[in-house]
Amino acid sequence: MNNILFVALGGSIGAVFRYLLSIFMLQLFGSAFPFGTLLVNVIGSFLMGTIYALGQVSQVSPEIKALVGVGLLGALTTFSTFSNETLLLIQSGAWIKAFFNIALNLCLCIFMVYLGQQLVFSRI
């Protein structure tokens, strides 16, 4: 039960952080390119790499993993998890799996956004 509270706390922090960064980038660069999303994905990927590496070289408590890895980064972006998993595939020599992971994530996610939009727009 404790870990659930850590996930919830991290999630609320990550969601607020994402919102504030997105607003900041929108004000700074306008809406011609999704710089806010790019920024949170890049930051989230960096933080995921940091947390993963810290867990490899030292003891990271389950509470910290829940707070930062699942909660904060989960709310900030799931792209960090995707990036970490892809890098692990590459580092293990599974280049073909890494390629398919990249291709499937990009293609399927873009398609699902399209599908979701079409579902909504077709009902309006």
Curated annotation (Swiss-Prot):
It is found in: Cell inner membrane. The lineage of its organism: Bacteria, Pseudomonadati, Pseudomonadota, Gammaproteobacteria, Alteromonadales. It catalyses: fluoride(in) = fluoride(out). Keywords: Cell inner membrane, Cell membrane, Ion channel, Ion transport, Membrane, Metal-binding, Sodium, Transmembrane, Transmembrane helix, Transport. Na(+) binds at G74, T77. Its main location: membrane. InterPro entries: FluC. The gene is fluC. The chain crosses the membrane at residues 5-27, 70-90, 95-115. GO terms for cellular component: plasma membrane. Fluoride-specific ion channel. Important for reducing fluoride concentration in the cell, thus reducing its toxicity. It comes from the Bacteria. It is a multi-pass membrane protein. Coiled coil: none annotated. GO terms for molecular function: fluoride channel activity; metal ion binding. It comes from Shewanella sediminis (strain HAW-EB3). Pfam families: CRCB. This is Fluoride-specific ion channel FluC. Belongs to the fluoride channel Fluc/FEX (TC 1.A.43) family.
